[in-house]
Amino acid sequence: MLNRGYLLKGETVEGAIERICSAAAQRLYKPELKEAFKEMVERGWMSLSSPVWANMGTERGLPISCFNVHVPDDIEGITHKLGEVIMQTKLGGGTSAYFGAMRERGSAVTDNGKSSGAVSFMRLFDTVMDTISQGGVRRGAFAAYLDIDHPDIEEFLSIKDIGHPIQNLFYGVCVPDYWMQDMIDGDINKRKIWAKVLESRQQKGLPYIFFTDNVNRNKPQVYKDMNLTINASNLCSEIMLPSTEDESFICCLSSMNLELYDEWKDTNAVKLAIFFLDAVLQEFIAKTEGNHYLKSANSFAKRHRALGLGVLGWHSYLQKNMIPFEGMQAKQLTTSIFSDIQEKASKASKDLAWIYGEPELLKGYGRRNTTLLAIAPTTSSSAILGQTSPGIEPFSSNYFKAGLSKGNFIRKNKYLRELLIQKGMDNEDTWRSIMLQHGSVQHLKQLTAEEKEVFKTFKEISQLEIIQQASIRQKYVDQSQSLNLNIPAELPVKDVNKLLIEAWKLGIKTLYYQRSQSVSKEMVTSLVTCKSCEG
């Protein structure tokens, strides 16, 4: 898996781990940490993000892949931000931008002309993605964010429609509380727009939804004190940081492997991970120093030092312990695990501040980093770690071809396989029947009801339950989580509407893609109910 684009020419996996961990230890002036970092990676406790694998400790590319720019309402500023995005993309970043500050189509501009509006400028960014390939590792990707009360919103929601000039961009809508409330209370115009959002998510999986007030109500204290607004997120909707015209947020990501939580929960693994990410940030700062187009990102990195340690392997951890994804036990574990990670990460940032000092923005706060946790999607990382489940998401199947950006791989759920071996059912016929049922085991008569619960797939799990679990987790995560929903096309739109309103009410900050895998009719109703509410 790693040979496909993440390693240097002729490099072995061991060589890459050596390169990365010694670079991290050097950045911290703590050569003694190299072995501890190596152990974390070799044991699979910490999963590195793709740009860290590809670029950390090398002369090429950047070890950070996540950027956002704030597009201002004047041509000079727009040109500069476009240049910034070109540079970020060329160096391997996934980029995003907030366009909400731009005036609407048709409004007056200084030379007596009329503005062509926010969406027309997005076409420039769309073209960049087509033109600039990222040193061969992966194609550029860009997400545009716009407020739902922006006058150009309807034009924006038709991006990616057949015949629309913009086809490469991903996009998200920023929705404030007042707007949601008006829409719920019956404002006709807002209902029309909301219906478009629901329809678009059902058909295209997009737009992402960014609940502006949920985000800003729960941002770190320093951002409240400095009056910094978080306007939009990144390409994967888990980053919650403020970009301005002068500063472009970047986020420094890697993840802890929850599948092995019981191995590392009583060690200093989380502390080491936070130290490691701070080192990655330091390398980013050094590599971008003096680069004209990365000045805003460099300034943000220095002043905020924002980190985003995430997790993967949550569903794997549950299955390993024969715990269903739905129900009280998984919710209680969510609380205990994430409060534990939060506490350790926070202490690590204090330790870093004590050793290396506080950055400019955090003088007097006793911390080295404005944020510490963010839960990214991790599809490739999960495969690198030997098929652990992605992020906080359930497995979408128990048996499938995994088509990742670096190729196709066949996989069987290893914990299910162990169970089938115990039952003398690990044979071609059983797996074939699972494949024909699209990766489900609900038809296997030899499994108990409890076992079937444990091996439910993403599309068979209540989406309300996924939202409730995410809202518990969100209390401990200072940024956000890449939260996908899997909603079958046949679910009535009023039920989908209820789910999204519930997500907003429960304080969810962002919703990522909406997938729609079909399930049987009986299944559909259970997708919007709550297991643990039934007692």
Please state what every model-predicted region is.
Residues 272-298, 302, 306, 321-378, ...:
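Internal maturation/activation junctions in enzymes
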Residues 6-10, 26-27, 31, 68-75, ...:
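Hydrophobic alpha-helical scaffolding
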Residues 1-34, 57, 111-124, 134-228, ...:
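Conserved, charged catalytic cores of large soluble enzymes
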Residues 31-37, 94-97, 136-143, 284-298, ...:
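Flexible, glycine/charged-enriched surface loops at secondary-structure junctions
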Residues 230, 237-240, 287, 373-524, ...:
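Catalytic alpha/beta core of large soluble enzyme barrels
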Residues 59-61, 88-91, 135-140, 201-203, ...:
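Solvent-exposed alpha-helices and their adjacent loops that cap or buttress functional pockets
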Residues 8, 21-29, 39-110, 118, ...:
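Function-dense linear segments that define catalytic or interfacial modules
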Residues 6, 20-28, 38-45, 83-90, ...:
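Structural signal for hydrophobic packing residues in well-ordered secondary-structure cores
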